[in-house]
Amino acid sequence: LWQARKKCPDLQVVPPHHDKYKHYSRLINEIYGRFTDMVEPFSIDESWLDVTASRRLFGDGKYIADTIRKTVREELGLTLSAGVSFNKIFAKMGSEYKKPDATTVISRDNYKKILWPMPVSEMFFVGGATAQKLNKAGIMTIGQLAQTERALLENMLGKHGSQLYDYANGLDDS
């Protein structure tokens, strides 16, 4: 906030409305519940849905995500972005890929094309300090992270390095 005020001295800061956020979060999660009972809230404005058992009734993951987005827009007047994938990490990254109102499918066939060219700092669970360490080692993209030997990443980052290797290669089974 101080950086924003420094760049824009006339900035008008509006106080947050936590009660409204919670209210809409609950309503959106109720909409999710119409499509699956496997809803895992991640934050006030994000949830993971497992729609595996819902596909026979509602259609594939992309169709379900698009239907949820349409329902939220029509009933609540809000937009949302959705990521559809074979694990939580890639689903989250898919939801970030096209904002503010889109569905992105990251599959086993396309994840290298979509995610690997991205800066390593865009990898879920790579914070600023980790990105700096990776960059210093010449690892600039998610693809380079994926192609780095696991042992080297473990040596650099400990257990987290091994996890990032799995995440970048789509080996996470969440």
Q: PLM features: residue spans?
A:
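Gly/Gly-Pro- and Ser/Thr-rich, intrinsically disordered tail segments characteristic of DNA damage-repair
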Residues: 1-169
